[in-house]
A protein has these predicted regions:
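C-terminal motif of bacterial Sec signal peptides marking the signal peptidase cleavage site
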Residues: 20-23
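Aromatic- and charge-enriched surface segment that lines or borders ligand/interaction sites
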Residues: 87-134
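Short, well-ordered beta-strand elements
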Residues: 36-49, 97-100, 119-122, 168-169, ...
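N-terminal lobe/hinge region of extracytoplasmic solute-binding protein
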Residues: 43-93
């Protein structure tokens, strides 16, 4: 959390929308154990529109995503791509195949493991025209992506596959040098059973979500102007 706090931006803040971040810590000093709570509040630039990672287009929702989700990779406070859920990212010589090895201890806030299939499902959902995601064109270099977005091919034909539980492979139609950056900024996993459980309510409030990032969202109802980010204990 220390590194994350360093990367927070406090510029261009506006009044009216307040978020609170809190975490509990246990420190041991001279053999004694001390429990304490840390919290901080800050103002966001606008209201959160959604917690659905496939439908986020505004800055406030994007800030939420950075805190409650973790993608294959992430950007550090110097905007460098560093490992997220993926421990390694490998590109083929021709640039058309990307392979990601995932951490085996990554979990959702409900205790489910984060697997390669969660990334396959999220990309299929993102590019499915039924989702109406405005992020689709970012990933149009994936095999069959244009056809899936047009509805002429099924999402299952997309060039994204889970080789095994913790190995994700992506096939591209042409080399995309910035693809690794895309995996750090616009591709978060989704727990399929949770998406299906909540249906149209998915992402409309804190309670209709599950999280795999360092924090979980609490208290956002979809319309209120304050909420909390709490430490993800998974």
């Amino acid at each position: 959390m220390k590194n994350w706090l360093k990367s927070l931006s406090f510029g261009a803040l506006t009044a009216g929308v307040v978020a609170t971040l809190s975490a509990c810590s246990n420190n041991s000093t001279s053999g004694a154990s001390q429990s304490y709570k840390k919290s901080m509040s800050w103002m966001t630039t606008s209201e959160v529109q959604t917690l659905d990672p496939d439908k986020m287009v505004d800055t406030a929702s994007g800030e939420q995503a950075n805190n409650v989700f973790e993608g294959l990779n992430r950007l550090n406070n110097k905007n460098q791509v560093v490992p997220g859920v993926a421990t390694t990212t490998t590109q083929s010589k021709d640039g058309l195949t990307w392979t990601f090895k995932l951490r085996k201890n990554a979990k959702w806030s409900n205790g489910d493991p984060v697997t390669a299939q969660d990334f396959v499902y999220s990309m299929r959902r993102k590019l499915d025209p039924k989702t109406k995601s405005q992020q689709q064109n970012h990933f149009d270099s994936i095999v069959n992506a244009p056809e899936v977005m047009k509805g002429t091919k099924k999402p299952s034909s997309l060039g994204v596959e889970a080789k095994d539980k913790y190995t994700l492979v992506v096939h591209l139609t042409h080399a995309t040098p910035y693809f690794k950056t895309l995996t750090a900024t616009g591709w978060n996993p989704e727990d399929e059973k949770v998406v299906k459980k909540y249906g149209d309510k998915y992402g409309t409030a804190s309670k209709y979500m599950v999280y795999n990032g360092p924090f979980t969202s609490s208290g956002w109802t979809g319309t209120n102007l304050s909420w909390k980010l709490k430490k993800n204990n998974q």
